[in-house]
Amino acid sequence: MPLKLKALGASDTLNAAVNKSLAAFITFFMTPFISFRSDRHRGKTGRRIPFLRWSTPFVGLFMVLMGFSDSFAALLSGTSQVFQIAGLTITKPVLTLILISIFLVGFDFTSSYVNTLFWYLINDVVPQKTMSRFIAMFKIIGFLAVMLFNKYIFPSSLDHFRLIFAVSGAAYVIGFMIMCFTVKEGEYPPPPSGEQPGFIPAIKTYWRERFSHRIYMLVFMTSVFYLLLSASSNFAILRNTAALGLSMKDVGNMNFYTGIVNLAVLFPAAWLADRFHPLRTFLWGLIAYFVLHLFQCVWIFKDFGEANLSLLYMFTIAQNCIMAILMTSEIPMYMRIFPRAQYGQFCGANAMIRTLFFIPGSILAGYCFDMLHKFTGPGDWQYRYYPLWTAVVILPGIFFAFSLRREWKRLGGASDFRPPEQVPPCGL
C-alpha cells in the first residue's frame, strides 16, 4: 500500500496518515468498547467467536474493494483525467486516493474486531506456560506466507494490485471462518455482578480498573514506544528502493532469503521467553534493536553503491533475529502481567493509550521525512534517516521497560507475581 500511494503522488505525510494514523484513530475508539463488551459477553459459542464470525466477512470485502479502487475511479471519471465533483477539480489519481481512504476506513473498522479478539481468543484457549512457543509456531506460518509473497508476488505487486487484494480478501475470510467453526472456547465464570447499567458507569468502571496501578501504566508506556517504532516503517521500503537504489526484485529476494533466518530463530527465541520470562527477553530485544539501528545510520553519511545490497542483507538478518525475540515476548508479556479474566479490557486500554501517541507520532514521522527532503535536496536521500527515527524513539521505550521490570520484581517477580486487582491509584 505505501508503494501504491507513492505511485499515486501522495506525500510522505499523507502516506503515513492514510496507512498508520487512520487505523490508529479507529482503534482508539473501537478497541476499548470491543474489549469491554467481549470480556462480559457469554454466548453459546463463547465470548470471542460470536464477534469474529460477523466481522470477518466485512474485512475481506473491504480488502477486495481497496484492490479495485482504480477500477471504481475509472468508472466514475470515464476517460477524463481531470473532472469536477461538487465544484471541486479532481484528478483521477486523487479520486483513487479518496476511494482507497474510504475503503480503508471500512477495513480498519471491521478489522479492529478481528485483530483485537483474535489475540484474546488465543489467551483464552492456549496454556500460558507454552504461550511463547505457540506464538512462535503461529509466526513461523505467517513468515512462510510472507516469504513466498516477497519472493513471487512483491516484485510485481503494483502490476497486479487488484488480483492480490482480491485473492487476499477471499483467503482471509476462508481462513478465519474455518477457525471460528472449529475452535471451541471453554467455560467462563459469570461476568462481574452489581455493576450499574449505562454508558457513563461503564466508562467509570473501565477507567478505574485499567488505570489503577503503576505496573499497568508502565506496561502501557513501554508498549507505546515499541509501537512507535512502526510509525516510520512505511519508509523502510522507500529507503531500500528509492534511496539505496535496490530494485523491487532485489528487495523481494532479500526478504525471502532473510526470512529463512527468521524461521530458524523464532522457536529458540520463544524458548528463551518461556525460560527466562518474556519481560526480560523483551527488554534485551529493545536494547539490541537500538544498537542495530545506530549502525544502520551509516547510510546517512555514505553510499556504498553495489555493496548496499550485501550490507542490507547483514542488517536485515540481524534485525530478524532481534525481532524474533521481541515478537515472541511482547504478547506473552502482556498475558503474564494483565489479569486473565479481564485481559481483553486491559489490552483495550493499552490500545487506547498507544493510539493517543501513535496518531500524532505517525503524522510527525511523515512530516519529518517531508521536511528532510527540503534539506537533503533532489533525490530521496531523506529516507536514509529512517533508522535514526527508530533509534530516537526506542530510548524512552527502554527506560519504561527497565522501570517495568523493577516494579514487576517488587511485586514478586518470576516466582511470586500476581496481577494487582483493585488498588489505590499510583502514578508514574
Please name every model-derived segment.
Residues 23-28, 132-154, 351-362:
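Glycine-rich segments within core transmembrane alpha-helices of 12-TM secondary carriers
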Residues 29-45, 265-278, 369:
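Helix-to-loop junctions at the C-terminal end of transmembrane segments
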Residues 187-219, 419-428:
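Juxtamembrane intracellular "pre-TM" segments in multi-pass secondary transporters
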Residues 1-14, 234-251:
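Short amphipathic helix-loop junctions that connect adjacent transmembrane helices
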Residues 65-73, 174-183, 299, 386-426:
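Multi-pass alpha-helical transporter architecture, strongest
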Residues 47-50, 86, 154-170, 369-394:
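A membrane-interface helix-boundary motif in multi-pass transporters
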Residues 280-327:
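C-terminal transmembrane helical hairpin of 12-TM major facilitator-type secondary transporters
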Residues 53-92, 288-305:
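C-terminal ends and interior cores of transmembrane alpha-helices
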